[in-house]
Amino acid sequence: MQYNFKVEAFEGPLDLLLHLIHRYEIDIYNIPVAEITEQYLSYVHTMKELQLDVASEYLVMAATLLQIKSKMLLPKHEEDVLDNGDDFIDDPRQELMERLIEYKKYKQVATELKEREQERAQLYTRPPIDFTSLQQEEETSLPLDVTLYDMLAAFQKLMRRKKAKKPVTTRITRQEIPIEQRMTDILKLLEIQGGRQSFYDLFVDDEREIMVVTFLAVLELMKNQQIVIEQEHNFDEIFVSSYTKSA
């Protein structure tokens, strides 16, 4: 089965690296290259396995990380270190670190500009505020913004869990299910469950092809703003809610 699925929200390899740095609380000035390379390659492999449209720059970054990793493994000769003991300039990670810091600044500025634009729009469009309900909203713990990279991590975890539960010998039967049909099934399930369901509970079938179709259906429903993905804290369980339920 071939599903060529393009997701515009994947912003590029630097965005993925920043996501990994944030997710695993890594110091951007002292990146553990071996660890970050392993995580990065795992994400790219999952994206390709799902037949998402992986841009060539992801593969270029993968090659760059592997090159940096190999340089980090080389023995460092004393003559390569500066006389003052500062070997920061010779650090193979230097260029990547500078690119990440620059990209992080760009993202922060873009986010601030977007927030200001939304605030200006609300000045002219929002109705009078009921301050009694506002106080209640402020006391409520808001869910985290769940990115597509978080969804990939959840799918990776799901695949590992399903693989561990599978018996040694399994009979494989191929079932071709259109993404549109699986989207309809998910929306019906949410309606039955009161508008909210655990992400993992959507994957009742252990067959890989059906799991892939289910995941792509979730992405398509997110893209169409028919469902909302919620997570209270980092690494917590992910829930899928119908858009009307979360509104």
From Swiss-Prot:
Keyword Isomerase: no
GO cellular component assignments: cytoplasm
InterPro entries reported for this sequence: ScpA, ScpA-like_C
Highest taxon, organism lineage: Bacteria
Main location, first listed in the record: cytoplasm
Keywords, comma-separated and alphabetical: Cell cycle, Cell division, Chromosome partition, Cytoplasm
Pfam annotation, one family: SMC_ScpA
DNA-binding keyword on record: no
Location relative to the cell: Cytoplasm
A GO biological-process term: DNA replication
Gene3D superfamilies according to UniProt: 6.10.250.2410, Structural maintenance of chromosome 1. Chain E
Record's subunit section: Component of a cohesin-like complex composed of ScpA, ScpB and the Smc homodimer, in which ScpA and ScpB bind to the head domain of Smc. The presence of the three proteins is required for the association of the complex with DNA.
NCBIfam families listed in its UniProt record: PRK00104.1-1 (NF000992), PRK00104.1-4 (NF000995)
Function (record text): Participates in chromosomal partition during cell division. May act via the formation of a condensin-like complex containing Smc and ScpB that pull DNA away from mid-cell into both cell halves.
Family: Belongs to the ScpA family.
Name the record gives this protein: Segregation and condensation protein A
Species whose genome carries this gene: Bacillus cereus (strain AH187)
